[in-house]
Amino acid sequence: MASPMTGTGRVIRRYLPAAALFVALLVAWQGAVTVFQLREYLLPAPLRVVQAMTGDEIPWLRHLSITSVEIVGAFGLAGAVGVFLGVAVAWSPILSRALVPFLVFVNTLPKVAVAPLFLLWLGYGVLPNMLIGALIGFFPVVINTAVGLSQVDEELLDLGRVFNAPKWKVFATIRIPNAYPYILSALKVTATAAVVGAIVGEFVASQQGLGYVIITTQGSMNTPVAFAALVWISVVGLAVYGLVVLAARRIAPWAETVD
């Protein structure tokens, strides 16, 4: 009989494939630079990117903190607005018929084209980039929340009717807990969408942040710093995604979702 896997064994089994893939990509990257003798402005070596990440050429802490605030703010705004609208869609068929076409219209707007309008209305700063990130990330939360609130076991709803529970109580005690896995799955998508939105905003309407660093360093052919900014963006995105995964395991440990 096989012995139960220890905590260390579970961690290794869970993260070893990703770590192995990461190492393989680094080796392939370094091999391509070495074999093809690529110039630094085309593709810098991994070690050169690490040096750029830890160097003092760029005030990384300042740019990193600004982008992090934008991403977290965009994620929080998209999540809150998305859940609220999803509840509204599921609450009333009239609201659903009124809101869904409008939300689809908003979601299909090209966000790069909307970004300059936010700059015109709000000026430079963190808020426009947060709004762009929220605009990209809110729609999956709306749809998943509405679906989760609707896909409820009829026996549970019958139980609520037996006790003459009002509609708001059925939502609070039956429908919303049922929607947790759907909402949390959507928030994982929103976590990455918030990163994309914040960086798009910094490309168009910012004078600070990691997206701004990429734009300025590409213009000067300083590719190692541009790659370093990309890595820092990925680190922030992974951190936000990881926090959502941890929250999902605590709030809805029964949910079968892909981490």
What are these regions (language model features)?
Residues M1-L21, G242-D259:
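Transmembrane alpha-helical segments of polytopic membrane transport and secretion proteins
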Residues S3-T8, V35-G79:
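Periplasmic/extracellular loop-to-transmembrane helix junction in inner-membrane transport proteins
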Residues P44-T54, A205-Q218:
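Short hydrophobic, aromatic-rich alpha-helical segments embedded in or entering the lipid bilayer
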Residues A74-L103:
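Transmembrane-helix boundary motif in ABC transporter permease subunits
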Residues L103-P140, V147-G148:
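Generic hydrophobic transmembrane alpha-helix motif, especially the helices
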Residues L131, L135, W168-G201, A228, ...:
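Transmembrane alpha-helices
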Residues V141-N144, G148-V189, L210, I214:
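Short cytoplasmic-facing helical segments at TM-TM junctions of multi-pass membrane proteins
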Residues G211-L246:
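Hydrophobic alpha-helical transmembrane segments of polytopic membrane proteins
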